[in-house]
Amino acid sequence: MKIFLDTANLEEIKKGVEWGIVDGVTTNPTLISKEGAEFKQRVKEICDLVKGPVSAEVVSLDYEGMVREARELAQLSEYVVIKIPMTPDGIRAVKTLSAEGIKTNVTLVFSPAQAILAAKAGATYVSPFIGRMDDLSNDGMRMLGEIVEIYDNYGFETEIIAASIRHPMHVVEAALMGVDIVTMPFAVLEKLFKHPMTDLGIERFMNDWKKYLENLKK
């Protein structure tokens, strides 16, 4: 399973890359606007850091606008993946871009039916939103599992990115299902390191080592 960071913050990305566990990044206009950065420049900076897939989202909603934006963004770096919303015009744009060899990520997916359309259009990635489904009192993980099963049934090449991840259990459950990729906020990535028994174990080892050094001085 690959791990992507869902952020536009360069410091967070640097840390993830230094840890050696981040394979890519997903962004959107909201994340980049929070950083106060110029959109295309920030996308280029992220690509220079991560050296892996970096999803950058179009803001047009019509077919022609999406394709035009996508072609421009694709020129920024070989690592750029174009995020396209799950709409009829979006799926049409994905079909066109896929034929041109431009990688795409269909976003705002909330049902297996939508995921089927993304795969049929030749999307490189599809991003079902788990946490947002949970917010609607629906089972986001069940939706994700159904998408995994459908893709396995038909051998679709589109990779599944579990998105809208809220906590470590989302990550674990997605991994158990065999999801290709999980994209998560930096705060969730940090939580993956944590377990109270680990902290207690480290504290105990350090105390024992301190006592050992004190005994050597006697």
UniProtKB/Swiss-Prot annotation:
GO MF: aldehyde-lyase activity; transaldolase activity
Enzyme class: transferase
Function: Transaldolase is important for the balance of metabolites in the pentose-phosphate pathway.
Protein's organism: Thermotoga petrophila (strain ATCC BAA-488 / DSM 13995 / JCM 10881 / RKU-1)
Gene: tal
Family: Belongs to the transaldolase family. Type 3B subfamily.
Subcellular localization(s) per the UniProt record: Cytoplasm
Pathway(s) annotated for this protein in UniProt: Carbohydrate degradation; pentose phosphate pathway; D-glyceraldehyde 3-phosphate and beta-D-fructose 6-phosphate from D-ribose 5-phosphate and D-xylulose 5-phosphate (non-oxidative stage): step 2/3
EC number: 2.2.1.2
GO biological process per UniProt: carbohydrate metabolic process; pentose-phosphate shunt
Protein name per Swiss-Prot or TrEMBL: Probable transaldolase
Entry annotation: catalytic residues: 83 (schiff-base intermediate with substrate)
Chief site of localization: cytoplasm
